[in-house]
Amino acid sequence: MSLVNCELMDHIVKILELRQVTHDVKQFRVEKPKGYFYIPGQATDVSVNRPDWKDEKRPFTFTGLSEDPYLQFTIKRYPERHGVTDLLHSLAPGDEIIVRDVWGAIEYKGPGCFIAGGAGITPFLAILRMLHQAHQAAGNTLYFSNKTTGDIIEHDELLLILGVSANFTLTRDPQPGYFHGRIDKTFLQDQLTDFRQPFYVCGTDEMVQQVSATLAGLGANPESLVIEK
């Protein structure tokens, strides 16, 4: 696929709006540079426009629609790192960040099974929102792992988009109506019957490696495993 985006360069943009999504996740809407284009599932490198932080770049996935008049990111804070996400969460509307060229991440290849852990849901948000807008979300299934219900990013919207095909599993705080435990071989064997469909996997490096290897061992075609690279 040929991807078209803006000229490769740094773009200084202002924060337009902030929304608290969970206790440690914020949604950022920022100015969209003229001619800036991305495909849902793609990402860019972001830094804060301050002298000591300009070169501290971190990758974040776009979570809005490509035709939106703004860029949107959904960013989890990691306070123990005392780094970029901490600083980003301290910013206010009017503050500036730097976005760079778009790079390919997760590409939608048709109806399948989305498997996410924590902040790994972010590339899927853009894809699922795109499908929902086009009335093409049917046929997709989501398995989303988090520690507690309070950690689930955009819980209600995912239910709206996917209905009963949105499945949530909790690893630390069992609750009625939710699966309990990690997404491991036993879980996948119990929940899945079609291993020929596309699988979209995003989460920690360890989770992606383990889930991808497990799916391949259960019969999934390696070419049908879509992971962030």
Give the residues covered by each predicted segment.
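FNR/FR-type flavoprotein reductase catalytic core
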Residues: S2, C6-L8, E80-K229
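Ferredoxin-reductase
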Residues: S2-P93, N146-T148, T171
